[in-house]
Regions:
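Helix-loop-helix
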Residues: 1-43, 48, 163, 256-257, ...
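Soluble non-transmembrane domains of integral membrane proteins
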Residues: 51-411
């Protein structure tokens, strides 16, 4: 054989040997797998074989039925979550209702099932044992665990409530006269729903905790406006929560009621816990201000209103008595007002929804409140509340003081951000009454803001006129002021220059401060309006010209793209009223600079004055259209007043009058005399210092 043949035979041998080893490896690797599978199948088969109820379990169930079951003739019956037990004489019977309306008798669970029924019996066995555990956990309340949820409605002209039998609570609250921008579209304003709101009362004994959120109540329609969610123990023993919704009201009466509960609850129980959790839903198109103006508010009994941070995660714990607690939105609130008070509180919490999460577009915050209430098992009404579910309207909230608490100011109007003390006083005593009066005329709210602006301008007219008169005098004196500045230049002549200025003002009867003071006195009104309009629910959803909602930005230009710097400054839109306000503000600044030439002589003042309107554009771009519209109208009226004053106040007449005043001997005013004396003392000190240096 040649070398090629030998090489071919060797290669064939290698291939055959390789395949043999490969097949041998597969057989060996498969063997453990097969053994594991067989063992797993055996284990599964063992697990799938249901054991039976033993004598101890049956005896325990029999004792439970006798202790917690309901009397039915000569039998005791106990039902829990589709499991029914019956004790008659000394025998125990029962059944388990399975899916598909299949029933398994309790007697069938007392011996091992056949292989065909083991899955069904396993499920039935689990239900029986869970029922026994529920009884151990809930004792007399076990009959109210499980079962299907039922919903009943309470409704009036303003509010629709869905009451859930699960927990006996308000599952959903819908405001009928308001719409909300939720899940990308407009619809009825739902304050909360069952998935994102829950509350309940809990009674703690030495051995058990009974939480109403875990029980299924029976709805009892007492009349058109009242529903009692009831846990009926039989024999005249019951516990319930009664809800009453009066006509044309946002105020829900919620009362905890009971009868003969001493048969179930020990008399040494003196407190009842209350827990309320809510994931606050978005309602507005303008996300920025909705986030800034939502959170947890609360009032101490006989004391002030406080709140958790509205812009960051926060929590607080107090041992003081609380009168009410509110989960407050920008324009709506859920307020629970206790007839008596809450006894302190576990940490109240507010957590801002992460901006990077999917929930951020639909929700604002996760909030919670935990507290306690006084409880007496023999009191037929151990706790009662007024539950406000409605708009943050000043007139409405202020009316509850007389309706609910005539002896104590509830201060619910503090839910509306109207500014600090002085600005709040201007809003509550002047702005809001006039605004409400104009609102009775059924005018468009854009017109109402215009009329309110005109009224404010009329009230401030004397101050504005005084300011412009002073500016006219300063314009007339501008050449003389320039002459003094040129004659006494430099810091070394500062005192002399200032003295000559004061002499000039005194001769002419002018005061450089008289123009500033009227403007300063007008400032609180502008700040008050800055607080009032963004919180005014009357503007919500009201259209005017191109603005579809005066409480939200009137976005004339929007974009989704991420534009560096631009997005950081403006967000993703530009508001037209804000742009108009900025343009008018620049015009007003120009006119004001022309009217006060002295400002142009100050380094950097000119550019500073023109920069301010641009800063306002950035600042107000996210605000509601109503506020920008107000400032736009106010500036237009101010410009009109400026031209009117220039027509009325002739500078020639002002100059002639000042010349006439200069001829008269004038007594120095107290301010001018003190200022001149101070200047002379400073000059003397300066001369003394110069002598010492020499």
């Amino acid at each position: 054989m040649d070398k090629n043949t030998i090489l071919g035979l060797l290669l064939m041998g290698v291939v055959i040997f390789g395949f043999s080893m490969l097949n041998s490896g597969d057989d060996q690797s498969n063997q453990p797998t097969t053994e594991k599978t067989e063992k797993a199948d055996a284990k599964q088969a063992t697990t799938d074989i249901a054991d039976s109820l033993n004598a101890n379990e049956l005896a325990r169930i029999k004792t439970i039925v006798r202790q917690y079951g309901k009397q039915d003739g000569d039998k005791m019956v106990l039902t829990n979550d589709n499991v029914s037990f019956t004790v008659a004489s000394d025998s125990l019977t029962g059944s388990v209702m399975m899916d598909g309306n299949m029933t398994v008798a309790l007697s069938d669970l007392q011996h091992a099932p056949s292989a065909d029924n083991r899955l069904l019996y396993n499920a039935a066995m689990k239900k029986v044992r869970d029922a026994a555990e529920n009884v151990a956990k809930y004792s007399d309340f076990v009959q109210f665990v499980g079962g299907g949820n039922k919903t009943v409605k309470l409704e009036n002209e303003l509010l629709t409530l869905d009451l859930s039998s699960k927990g006996g609570q308000i599952a959903k609250a819908t405001l009928k006269k308001y719409t909300a921008f939720q899940h990308g579209k407009d619809g009825n304003c739902v304050l909360f729903d069952s998935k994102h709101n829950s509350y309940g009362f809990a009674i703690n004994t030495d051995t058990h905790r009974f939480d109403t959120k875990e029980f299924n109540f029976t709805p009892v329609q007492e009349n058109d406006s009242t529903v009692l969610m009831k846990l009926d123990f039989g024999k005249g023993v019951y516990f319930g929560i009664r809800y009453t919704l009066p006509k044309n009201s946002y105020l829900v009466r919620m009362e905890v009621v009971q009868q003969n509960m001493a048969a179930v609850i020990s008399s040494n129980v003196s407190t009842m816990d209350f827990e309320w959790n809510q994931k606050m839903m978005r309602h507005e198109k303008g996300q920025t201000f909705e986030e800034r103006n939502s959170g947890v508010f609360y009032k101490f009994s006989g004391d002030d209103v406080e709140n958790l941070s509205e812009t960051s995660n926060d929590e607080d714990k107090t041992n003081n008595h609380l009168k009410w607690v509110a989960f407050k939105y920008q324009f709506f609130s859920c307020v629970l007002i206790a007839d008596q008070h809450f006894i302190g509180a576990a940490p109240m919490k507010s957590a801002v929804i992460d901006k990077n999460s999917e929930e951020h577009n639909d929700f604002l915050k996760d909030v919670s409140f935990n507290s306690s209430l006084e409880y007496n098992v023999n009191n037929p009404k151990p706790a009662a509340f007024n539950f406000f579910l409605g708009p943050n309207e000043y007139k409405l909230l202020s009316s509850f003081d007389d309706k609910i608490s005539p002896d104590e100011d509830l201060e619910l109007t503090r839910l509306i951000p109207l500014g600090w003390s002085m600005f709040r006083w201007i809003n509550t005593c002047i702005i809001i009454p006039i605004f409400n009066f104009l609102g009775t005329m059924n005018l468009n709210y854009g017109i109402i803001i215009l009329l309110l602006t005109i009224f404010i301008k009329l009230v401030l007219f004397p101050l504005t006129y005084k300011s412009f008169s002073s500016q006219a005098k300063m314009r007339v004196l501008a050449p003389d002021i320039k002459e003094i500045n040129d004659k006494y230049p430099g810091n070394e002549n500062a005192m002399k220059r200032q003295q000559k200025m004061m002499e000039l003002y005194n001769r002419a009867g002018a005061n450089p401060m008289s123009g500033c003071l009227p403007m300063i006195l007008q400032l609180p009104v502008y700040v008050a309006m800055f607080s009032f309009l963004p919180s005014c629910i009357e503007l919500r959803g009201e259209s005017f010209l191109w603005a579809s909602d005066l409480s939200a930005p009137d976005m004339i230009l929007e974009w989704d793209a991420n534009i560096p710097v631009i997005n950081w400054i403006f967000g993703h839109h530009l508001s037209l009223f804000c742009l108009l306000m900025t343009g008018v503000n620049i015009i007003y600044t120009y006119l004001n600079m022309q009217a006060n030439p002295s400002n142009n002589q100050m380094p950097g003042m000119k550019w500073m004055m023109y920069l301010m309107p641009v800063m306002f554009l950035v600042f107000f771009n996210d605000y509601g259209a109503g506020l920008s519209y107000y400032y736009f109208i106010s500036l237009l009226i101010t410009i009109a007043q400026t031209y009117a004053f220039r027509f009325i106040i002739k500078e020639d007449k002002v100059r002639a009058k000042m010349a006439e005043n200069a001829k008269k001997p004038r007594k120095k005013s107290g301010f001018m005399a003190r200022l001149e004396a101070a200047q002379k003392r400073q000059e003397a000190m300066l001369r003394e210092q110069q002598k010492r240096k020499k």
